[in-house]
Structures are given as C-alpha cells and as structure tokens.
C-alpha cells in the first residue's frame, strides 16, 4: 500500500493522449445522428401521424393514443437500423441522477421463436417500482406501483444499443416523483402567463418558450491516482489534503492552453454529444488547476435539462476511456475554486422576440421593462426559495465562499438598466409618456442603446445577474439537476406575471388607458422589488448586514433553507401555477433532508475509516522511525549532544503524538455524535443535527490530518497529494 501512490503517479505520467476518430462529415451533418428528431419523424412516420405529433410538441395538443403504435413502429424501425436491440424509459428521479431499465425488442412469435416488437403501449407508459426510489413517504414498500410516461416534447435518443425514451415518473396516485413532471408544469405556467402579458403588445403571440443555456464546470483527475483516494471514490470530494504550494494563485490556468490528454477527451466528448443532439459550443480551462468547462448553445428549457443530464453521464464514460475520472462535485478540493453550473435563462415568443432584450420602439422597450421588472419581482418574493432550490450537501461547500455567488440571492442589473428603472420610479408620470393623437400613449423612456448587451458590466459576486438579453443564475451547483432551479424560477415568474396582469386589467376596467395602467403597475413593482437589486460586492460583510435590513433571506444552514419550500407563500405560488401540490412539496423536502443526512453520514464514515486505517498508522510509523533515530544519536553522541542534534525530530515526535491523539479522540466524538443524531426520527431535525454537530467535527479532524501531511515523510504518505491530483493530466 505504501508504494501504491507512487505507482499510480508513475502510471499517470506514462499515459499519452488517445487518438480520437473524427467523423469525415461536418459537425452540422452528424449533429443529432442518434436522435429521433423532426427529420427522422418526417421520414419514418405517415404524414398525418407526423402532423399530429408535431402539434403535440409545438402547441401542447393532447397526445392522441391512436397514433402511439405508428410512432412506436417508426422509432423501432429507425433504432434497429442503427443497431439498437433494447429500449428504456429514461427518467429523472429525486436521486439527482437518471434511471433506466433496459428491455429487449423481443416477444414470442407463437412458433417457438422470437419476433422484434415495440408497441405504442410500451412507448407511452411503463410501471417502475416507485417505492425503490426516493419518494418522501408517498409510496410504502408494499405500495410499489409507479408510472413512467413518455414526454413527446423531448426526442428519444440512442445510447450504445439502447433507445432512450425521456419520460416523467409519477406515483400510482399521481404525485410527481421526478424533476421532469413539475418542470413541464412550470414551463406551461410561464408560457400561459407570459403569453397573456405579451398580448398587451402583440396579439399575434401564441406561445412563450423558456430557454436555458447551462455552463457545465468539472474537474478531471487521472484514473490511477483517483483510484488510490478512497474519499474521492466514495464521496466525490477529498475529505483531507493540504493545499498545494502552487494552486490557482498565478491565474495561469483560466483560458490557458488545454493539456493534450484533456483536449483528446474534450474532442471525443463533443463528437458524441453532438451526435446526441447536444449543441456544444464552448470549451476551456477554468480558474482552478484541473478544472474545465463545457457550454452549449441555449435550448428550450426542458430539452436543455435533458441534455445536461445526458452529458453528465456521457462525461463519466468518455473520461474513463481516456484514463480520467470526472469530478462533478461542487467542491472536490479545499482551498481552490469549486464548480458551478451557471443557468442562463430567458423567454422567447413564437414570433421571434426575446423578451429580456431591449427593442427599437417605445412599445418594445416598455415590454422589455415589464418582463425585467416582473422577473425581479419573482426573485424578490421568492429569494429564499430560489436559494433553497440550489442548496445541497455538496453545494453547501461552495456557496458563500469567495469563489462563487454568496448564499444571499440578489440581482445585478448594470448601471444602464439600474438608471432606467430609477428614472421610471422617480420621474413624474407626465414625463414618462406623451399623448400622440389617436395613437394612444407614447413612452418617453430614454433610449436604451442596442449595444446594451456590451454595456452591461459583469459582477461575478451576483447570484442572479442580468447579462444583456437574459438572466444568469450562478448559484446552481455543478452536480445538480438544472430542473430544480428552473422549476422555482419559472413558477415564480409565472406568478409575478399573473399578478401583474390582474392589476393592470383592474386599472383598465376602471377606465385607465392600457399603457398608463402598465406604467402605474410597473412603477409600483419597481419600488417593491428594489431590495433585490444590488450592484456591489456580494462577498462583503457589509452586504450581509444590508441584506438583513432589506428583508432578504440570509439563512446559510442547508437543511433549514429547505423550509422555504413549505412556507405559505411558496405553497400558494406552486398551487396557483399548478406546478406542485402541498403533498408533493412536503414529500420532496423529506427527500432533501434524507439525502443531506445520508451524504454527510457517508463522509463521516469515510473520514473515520481513512484516518484510523491510513493516517494514524502512517504517522505513528514515522514517529517510531524518528524515535529510533533519536535513540541511535543518543547512543552514539551521548544524551546531551544527541538530544541537541535531534531537536527537530523530537519536536516532530511530540507534534505527531499530539495530533494523532486529537484525531483519535475526534473520531470517537464523531462516532458518538453520529449515534445520537441517528436516533432522531424526524428527517428535518436529523439533517440539522448532522449539519450543526457532525460537519464541524469532520472539519476539526481534517485540520489535524492536513497538518500531519506537512510533517510526515512523503515516502510514507499513502494518499496522493493535491499537487498530484491537480497537476498530473
């Protein structure tokens, strides 16, 4: 075991970049090669079936079960032509991963043989065991039935020899047990609410689509070195390890030259992702050593979420092929930046208008201001809930550190937009518009330059920043399912727009002009949501105090943050928008608390095992070597001179004794504290106990271990150090 670390390091240095077979076609030609997209639908489906299916996808029409057999037959034909032998209902349970059960395209032919079959019934619906997935008590073990149901708005795709069918996952009694079902409901809610508001400006708008562009950060670690770190293998992060002398302080990794092995991995990943219809656009080194980013072109929100889940799975497979392990944990290494997944969110009409982009006419700019302000209203009203949507045991390590957005949700708008909203709020109403004959009201809002997108500065400390034509939600964790944040954001914006329209309609019904009514409500909302606007340093202590004064949620305990899901305002918002019921919210919180507890529990067990089976034996072994050296020197030179010559060694012997004693007592305390916490039956209280009592004890043990790493002989230390984990690739 002593030499395993060095063998792993030597093996890592011997690795060379793999040759990647690049397709002869252009990327645009092999894009979505493994996706049953519209082109394939048109080719394989009867025209009337194709038109009915696209009506479902584009217009939300009810799926006609009569076409399911035709669609299933076409999918099977296309899939088998591409070497597919199995199919699966691919869904996203509350594990934050994906789930799938593969079935073959075979049935008895009645003659002792087999025949390839795939019916509309198998396409549309299956029955996984709902009790075996996180369900928050909705399903008991003896109440196993759940349903997965086809989502036709997200195209099926091929992974290896399996046809993957995106589905929702619900209980026998209809409650959502996944991320996709409430996401689809939230997208419907924001579509309906935004479309109604758009009709103030353009009656031709029939649909508003929420877009999402995610930016996936990750770390790559050599597979051999990774295999000698049990903490990385079992928890996704290093539970111990002293800083490397060189980490990110030189600012030389960000946008630096991509290492050759990593470049080969990225190339291979992009080719496979493009074949799966994921429109990869950007790749680069991130700030921390060993950290990288991949970002696609934005897509419709539901599809973007599916693509991110596919990509995270694909990354692991491709990394293994190239001799790496990909780390998606938000904070795999202490002392350097963690990983996030910025979610760029926007709304677009079916007439091609981006609702968060300024226009060329006064009416366009009024519409722009409406959607900006109502988005801010949503974030203001539900800032604590938005934070809860991105909180987890893993993201807890990243949020609030001076590397990521703070754990207080605020919005940065930039000087131009801030000045505009201040002008609308403070100016006399008569100065904001003028009457222009029979054309009605004409806004006198100062011109918003077309270069707004370039004139909007960046504030990396802002969790929810306006970046010219969209909002960037930066608090989402790298390992998270984007749907969690998008469900809350879409529902909150839908509620804000609905409330806005009700008030405007009331003023119009009272005889006020439409434009005047819109301005009245917008001015009121600008004042109301002003506390959410913050353009300063989100890391400062002054901001934390100011945020409390503004009434913003400043809670930093992850388990306590989950309470926001069951606040009266949150439940009312989810029920108003038909996104989730009170029972579904309650069940999800149970899952969140249980998941938090289990993750910390695993970490506590792993750190206890590592320190007692690796660190303490290594340290005491080195201590014994030093003691023998001291005794030998005394035997040769005499007690007085021998002690003088070995003064440094004696000091280290004492330090090792003190630190190992603290570690051993710390592990004993950790175990006893865990036993106390495990006796707590309430999921929320147990999670809080783990957060408040166990996490600090783990940190105290780590502190002693990291100090020992600096004094114990490098030759004896069995766990790869940060310099090896981060710089050998």
Positions of predicted regions on the chain:
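Active-site core of metal-dependent hydrolases
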Residues: 30-142
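Short linear, low-complexity motifs centered on an aromatic residue
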Residues: 96-113, 130-131, 229, 236-238, ...
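Histidine-centered catalytic micro-motifs
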Residues: 89-92, 341-345
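Short, solvent-exposed linear motifs at loop/edge-of-secondary-structure regions
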Residues: 60-61, 66-96, 215-222, 462-481, ...
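C-terminal amphipathic alpha-helical interaction region
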Residues: 524-729
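N-terminal hydrophobic targeting/anchoring segments and the immediately downstream early-domain regions
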Residues: 1-24, 132, 141-157, 162
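Flexible inter-domain linker/hinge segments
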Residues: 5-11, 20-42, 188, 192, ...
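Glycine-rich, acidic/polar active-site loops that bind/position phosphate-bearing ligands
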Residues: 143-328, 333, 337-340, 347-590
